[in-house]
Structure formats: C-alpha cells, structure tokens
Swiss-Prot record:
Contains ten tandem EGF-like repeats strikingly similar to those found in the cysteine rich 'stalk-like' structure of integrin beta-subunits. X repeats lie at residues 449-488. This is Integrin beta-like protein 1. Keywords: Disulfide bond, EGF-like domain, Glycoprotein, Repeat, Secreted, Signal. VI repeats lie at residues 270-320. The gene is itgbl1. One of its GO terms (cellular component) is cell surface.
Length: 488
C-alpha cells in the first residue's frame, strides 16, 4: 500500500473508533432544534404591524411576529410593509386609473410628462377656448361640473377644500358626504362602503346608511338573493338582508346600469361602445330589456346594429305573424318580416308557424308532463285510459266512499272546493267554465297574477295562486324578462 494512502486509512479508522465510543444522546432530536416561534411579545408584534390610523396591516393582511402578511385578492394585490398599497388605491378618471396618463405607485399617481392632477387628468398646456372647455365639462343636465367643481381645459376639478376626496367623478357628480351617518359620524355607519354617495352594506346590515341590522336567518337571506343562474345577486351586487343592492359603480370607477331583483339585468350589454355617460342603447334602433336588445322593425343584431331588408310593411308583417291568434306569434315569440322566432330560441317546447303550440302548458309544478298519464300535443294533454283532467291528474277509478272523498275536498272554512268546483276521489276539480280558478281547493284566482302584453305571466310561466312561477330562462314578476341566450 502507498504510504500516503496508508496514513489516510489509519486516520479514518481512528475517527470511526472515536465516534463509536461516544454514547448516544437520548435528548437529541428535531424537537430540540432552536425554536422558530416568535420571541416578540404580542403587544410589540402588533405595534410593528399597526398603521398610523390604528389598523393592523391596513386591514388587508395578518400580523406574524411584527411582519405583515398581505392578502392576495383576485382583482389585484396588496403590498407594502404594512399592506398599505393596492392596485385600486390610486385615483381614477373616466374609468381609468391615473386617467391612462400615469402609473399607480402605492396610492399616488406618477403622471406622464404633460399631465398633472391627483389622477393625471389635467394637461399642463391647454389649446381649448373657454367655450369649448366649458362644453366638455357639462353633465347630462348641462351643468358645469355639477356645481361642485371648476372646469380646467375641458376637465372638472372637484372642490375638496379639506383634501378629503369625497367629491369626485368625471363631472364631480359623486358626493360621498351623503354616506355619513349623522349619529355615528362614520361612513355608512361603519357597516358598509360608500360609492358615489350610496352605501353598500356588509352582510347582516341594511338601510340608506347601513343603520339597521338584519333579523332573518342567513339561509333565508341567501335564498332570497340567489339569482336564476344560482349566483348571489348575479355576482353584480351585494346581498343585504335578503335584498340585492346592485353595484352602480365597480372598484375601478366604472359605472354599470345594473338592476333586477337579483341584479340579473346589465344594460351595459346593450351598448355598442360602453360609455357610462351615454344613453345610446341598442345603436338607437331598439329598446334595452334586461341587457337584451329588442330591435325595432327593420333592424337586427345583438345590439340592433344591422338593417334588415324586408319587403313587408310593419302592419303586413304583424298580420302574417298573428294568424288566428290574438297577438303576433301568440305572444310567445318575436315577429320579424312576417316570420316568428319562438321563445326560447332553440327550445322545441314552443313551436308552430305562429308559435301557437306551447307544450310547457302540459307540465305541472313538479315538471311532470301530463301527470305521467298522458301525452302532450300542441300544449294539450291527451290522457291515457282511466285518467282525466287538464293535466291528466285525476284517476277515474275511486276506492273512496262519497263521505271520505268530500272530507278531503273541504277547505278550512268547511266549504267544498271553495264553492268553485266539484269533488272527485278526494280531489277538487275546478270549474272549467271559470278558467282562472285553480288551487288544491279551487281557492286561487289566476287573474291576480301579473300580466304583460295582456297575457298572465306573459305566457312564460304558471300562475300559482297569485304568483307567477316562471319557466326556465324567464324572470320578472310577470315572467316578462328573458335571461337565456340571444336570438340566432
């Protein structure tokens, strides 16, 4: 063996022997490694995370041993030592952060060359005449800067002498001082946020200033606010004590014409180019109905942007669509140049040259067709042998005595079928001569249901004892709002 190699071998052998002689320490384990727990007292940790206004991590994160761990939101992110910075913090003008003429740097707009102002909305040089400048500063009522600011080179500078920033908007139309609660002196009573003078309350609070606490269960609140597509307020509003408060303004400053019991209608879909200060719906050739354009005769397209060639006059077109019905397309479709497009588009349940057949009329409230005892033909049930009734819901054979049957047909007031029908095998058969009578005991009057275009529930739902139960794709008190896909 080489001398150098022999020396290394002897050294290694000695080291192994030395380590073997050391007794194992029973106390050595990962648990005995130095602790990573915070050594700061809780008070000191919180102090390091507290902002000058007293909030922990600006209310946008959690404090971990004196260090702020900022939350990450889908619409942007919080950052900074105290989570004080956010993509939304900077001022906006005309729907754009820093007016599109600068960069947002932790709540302050850094303006490009040639622009100034808290939102970089003012050009440093102006080549407009005073008349032209004032015209550009007028709101929809022709008032310059809503009498809440001054006009500078065609742009409004809102009066905020205390630098509160509570008056803002392209035309200084927003005044958040209206959100102050006179009693608590807090914005929205401390239970909501203010956008353009309107309070948007936190869950469990409601009122103009979020001053009232809700007294119904969370389950009932959610149920009332769930939109037809299963979302809370259609993701376009806030659920407040079972009622949807639709967002008129989103966090970027953009306005939305949003309405409906569950904020299901968004009128922005009716504008070819969205401008929150414009009323140019449906290209000027139609009416916006819950975010869908109903075009005037002679126009077509999702936003009525295309002229339609038709050789028929308006009256000739309607007459051709009406046929023998009382209304064009039987009130169940759209008439275009003498041809009916039935509601809902692509649904085979409504059909016919004039949309005269509506097989939805064969469904009961549980969705069964003709009570599963018959077939539907053009909206009328053809019952199997042994069954009868409008929806084939009555069996001809009966194993009850007459007394047993009558006892089940009496309402709480002791009257048989409310005096508006006959009793068969324990069930009321409402008088066919009085078409509007319905209900388990013939106690309901379908004439109480809301109408639209002269039709109960607009023909798009079932009247259930005074309330319209709308079919899929329809909404509104009279089922007059179509929420489904656009016409082909």
């Amino acid at each position: 063996m080489h001398a150098g190699a022999f020396i290394n071998f002897v050294w290694a052998l000695s080291l192994v022997s030395l380590l073997a002689a050391v007794p194992p320490s029973p106390s050595f384990s990962l648990k005995n490694l130095p602790s990573t727990a915070c050594r700061l007292p809780p008070a000191v940790s919180e102090k390091r995370c507290r902002t000058p206004d007293g909030s922990i991590c600006s209310g946008r994160g959690s404090c971990d041993c004196g260090i702020c761990l900022c939350e990450v939101k889908e619409a942007g992110k919080y950052y900074g030592p105290l989570c004080e910075c956010h993509d939304w913090v900077c001022h906006t003008y005309d729907g754009q952060v820093c007016a599109g003429h600068g960069q947002c740097d932790c709540g302050v707009c850094k303006c490009d060359v040639g622009w100034s102002g808290e939102a970089c909305q003012y050009p440093t040089t102006c080549d407009l005449t005073r008349k032209k400048s004032n015209e550009m500063c007028k709101n929809s009522q022709a008032v310059i800067c809503s009498n809440a600011g001054t006009c500078q080179c065609g742009r409004c500078k809102c009066e905020n002498s205390d630098n509160s920033g509570l008056i803002y908007g392209k035309y200084c139309e927003c005044d958040d001082t209206e959100c102050f609660d006179d009693e608590t002196q807090e914005i929205c009573g401390g239970h909501g946020k203010c956008y353009c003078g309107n309070c948007y309350c936190e869950a469990g609070w409601h009122g103009d200033k979020c001053e009232f606490q809700c007294d119904i269960t969370p389950w009932e609140i959610k149920k009332r606010c769930t939109s037809p597509d299963g979302k809370i307020c259609s993701n376009r509003g806030t659920c407040v004590c079972g009622e949807c408060t639709c967002h008129d303004v989103d966090p970027t400053g953009d306005w939305g014409d949003i309405h409906g019991d569950t904020c299901e209608c968004d009128e922005r879909n009716c504008k070819s180019v969205y401008d929150r200060y414009s009323d140019d719906f449906c290209s000027g050739h139609g009416q916006c109905n819950c975010g869908r354009c109903d075009c005037k005769d002679g126009w077509t397209g999702r936003k009525c942007e295309h002229p339609r060639a038709c050789a028929l006059s308006i009256e000739e077109s309607k007459k051709k669509c009406q046929g023998s019905a009382s209304q064009p397309c039987s009130g169940r479709g759209k008439c275009e140049c003498g041809q009916c497009t039935c509601f809902p588009p692509g649904d085979s349940k409504v059909y016919g040259k004039n949309c005269e057949c509506d097989d939805r009329q064969c469904e009961d409230l549980e969705g069964k067709i003709c009570g599963e005892h018959g077939t539907c033909s053009c909206g009328r049930c053809i019952c199997e042998a042994g069954w009868f009734g409008k929806l084939c819901q009555h069996e001809r054979k009966c194993n009850m005595t007459e007394e047993e049957s009558k006892s089940q047909c009496e309402s709480d007031d002791g009257i048989l079928c409310s005096g508006k029908g006959s009793c068969h095998c324990g069930k009321c058969i409402c008088s066919p001569q009085e078409w509007y009578v319905s209900g388990e005991f013939c106690e309901c009057d379908d004439r109480d249901c809301d109408k639209h275009d002269g039709l109960i529930c607009t023909g798009n739902g079932i009247c259930n004892c005074g309330n319209c139960e709308c079919w899929e794709g329809w909404n509104g008190n009279a089922c007059e709002i179509w929420l489904g896909s656009e016409y082909p």
